[in-house]
Amino acid sequence: MRKQKNPAVNTANGCALLVVLAVVLGMVAVLCGITTFLSNFNSPQPTPAPTTAQLDLAYSPEKDALMQDIVARFNKANNRTPSGLSMKIVATKMEAADMVDAARAGQFTAISPDSSLWLAQVDAGRDTPLVGESTRFAVTPIVIAMWNDTAQSLGYPQKQIGWQDLLNKAKSDPNFKWSHPSSNTAGGLLTTLAEFYAGAGKTRNITEDDLTNKTTSDYVAALEKTVRAYGEGEQATIDQVIAKGRSYLDAFVVSERMVIYYNGKSSQKLVAIYPAEGTLWQDHPIALLEQPGLTDDQRLTYRKFRDFLLSSEIQKLVLQSGYRPVDLNLRLDDPASPIKKANGVDPTQPQTTLQMPSAAIMDKVQSSWYLSKRPANIYLVVDTSGSMADENKLKQAQDALNSFLDQVQGQNDRVGVVPFANSVYGTVPLKDITTQRAALKNQVNLLAANGRTALLDAVSYAYDDLQKRNEKDRINAIVVMTDGIENASSISQNSLTQKIKRNNVSGVPVLIFCIGYGSDADFDVLNALADPTGGFARRADPDTIKKLYKILSTYF
């Protein structure tokens, strides 16, 4: 007989097959899902559509409060492009020289330095101009700021004071201290140009022959040799005057707006002297940068912001901030205007505006300044104690020192090096920078970290050498860098500071600038060394020390 199939077995087998099939199908589905996910993950994702037409703007520090106010008002208005993008300004405060480098590196799409001089620097050496559309929105004349009684001693306000009066005062009074910024700043370069104009007896069309004429160059050199020291710019000068008062300087070159700014903060009043020979202006432009990838919407944002700067609302704000507006419908003699004699300035001045020459002539003015400037003796006092080996600090300091040596460009400047650890060692006497730059760099590169911190002995060594040289016709200065606390000197802090105070009056005035490198530097000691000389102490770290040495180089 044939064997009959068991129905229960058939049913069980069928169920098992269904389960296996379901599992297989499930695994296939999972694998397909993973494959799809990985495919989507590895595939280029669409770039989200932009929601803003952003303009990245760098602006010079002296107009920080004004620019922040303007940008906040513009962004609050929520202007939009025809395509619906929100127009936005992102503004960054930056020194003009750094602004030029950042613009050339593609970091910004617009800039607003204190002078159009910097726009030429942005395009220098480029085949294709980077600077596009530009316009000025605020102006301020270059003036000589003086204490009211100092100006009166020169005949103010009955007499119009000029560069010759300043020269006569500096020659007749050895205690008279005046300054202007380095020619690496717009204010300093415009001042130097004004001096050359005065020496040439011109107000227009200055030529290269005028700059090299012996009578003119002798006049400028005589004036420059009475400068106490130079500096990094007008904002830094005003900050020092606010901190130290009239003992810091008797007269100094800044913009008119800075006189108003200072007088609003102090009971000791400055007056603005508009040189009788004529003066120049800082014109505060805003310029679009033709960066690769600049969009039409970003251009529209620039133009909208430009028009906003020129609007009646913002031009009134410009005037309220102490600048002169470019809108000539706004009267400087309006009762609400800060440009008034009560604030130390004169809305009817300057009577004579000097003509701006070509970029080629301006380059020649700067190179001529290096020949005419007051020469300097500069000692670099360098901490090489054991702690300088930490965090690669010594290597960063060496790079910064070498950068400083590159920045010192005066034809007659001298630089020396005084390293210290357990004691002063391996000193390099003052050398002519133009012929010994490489040798000085080599000595800097040989420095090694070891030992303790004989800071006071090192400063005393450099100070005594400058006193022995007795070269009062030079700027004499010590730039000190230390990362720690004095613990190895034979001279006491009190003995050293008393010697400095005494000899700076009876002997050779020496400026001392101190860098506290890192968080362990003793600023009580550094300030005690710097303050009596008219110098200052500032903090740096491995990321900022190179920039600080570069800033300090502008004082010489």
Language-model features and meaning:
Residues 132-144, 217-224, 266-294, 298-299, 306-329:
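Periplasmic-binding protein-like
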